[in-house]
Design a protein with these regions (language model features):
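Acidic, low-complexity terminal tails and accessory targeting/binding regions
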Residues: 1-4, 76-88, 149-192
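Short, active-site-adjacent cap segments at secondary-structure transitions
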Residues: 14, 54-56, 75-76, 143-146
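Phosphate-handling substructures
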Residues: 25, 62-121
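Generic structural signal for well-ordered alpha-helical scaffold segments
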Residues: 35-39, 118, 122-129
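Conserved histidine-centered catalytic loops in small-molecule metabolism enzymes
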Residues: 40-72, 98, 150, 173-192
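Short beta-strand scaffold positions
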Residues: 49-50, 119, 138-139
Length: 192
């Protein structure tokens, strides 16, 4: 049986303070945006969610039941950079930031490297049972990037070349170890 995996990137609050590993709760406007896209997502037996507050709130705002937390879908561990802005990290550890953004094996912050994140997400994807059917998961943007790299067999250096805005959906189909990116035509009336 083919697995149909839809990854929905969590919504972002209106007043967004972008920080490494930031977990700002959703405001009413962001929750309304989630409800607006809910109908475009496929039906699934449950909605998996990463453990962050904004992923859980996004999953709950979809109105799908039950919402099941999946710890393996957690965001990248940013170590010492956790809670800091890009500007703060650049000012305090510019060389480390440059290394991290150019070398997927690097983890100058003492947390998880891009390569480690990619390996964790690949293991989760390939561990899905072949009879999983439809799977919908709300994830952070880094997790969606890692899943795309795995599905396409793309080099990990491509991680930073993928722009994944909040509430964007990625659909992958296949079986463990063999994945395809599925792109739906605009205006087809076809849901993801």
């Amino acid at each position: 049986m083919t697995i149909r995996l839809t990854l929905l990137c969590a919504a972002a609050p209106t007043e967004r303070d972008v920080r490494f590993g930031g977990d700002t709760p959703l405001d009413e406007r962001a929750s309304g945006q989630v409800r607006g896209v809910a109908g475009a997502l496929p039906a699934a037996p449950s909605c998996l969610t990463a453990p962050s507050q904004r992923c859980r709130q996004t999953a709950e705002a979809l109105g799908r039941a039950p919402v099941v937390e999946e710890p393996k879908l957690r965001d990248m561990d940013m170590g010492r950079w956790q809670g800091r802005t890009l500007d703060e990290v650049a000012a305090g550890d510019g060389a480390g930031l440059a290394q991290w953004m150019s070398d997927p094996e690097a983890a100058p912050h003492g947390g998880e490297s891009v390569a480690q994140l990619c390996a964790r997400i690949a293991a989760w994807m390939d561990g899905l049972p072949d009879d999983a059917g439809r799977v919908v998961a709300v994830v952070e943007q880094a997790v969606a990037r890692a899943a795309l790299l795995h599905a396409l067999g793309a080099p990990r250096q491509s991680f930073w070349r993928i722009d994944v805005p909040p509430l964007s959906a990625v659909q992958l189909t296949g079986r463990s170890g063999r994945w395809n990116l599925r792109i739906a035509p605009v205006g087809s009336g076809e849901s993801l």
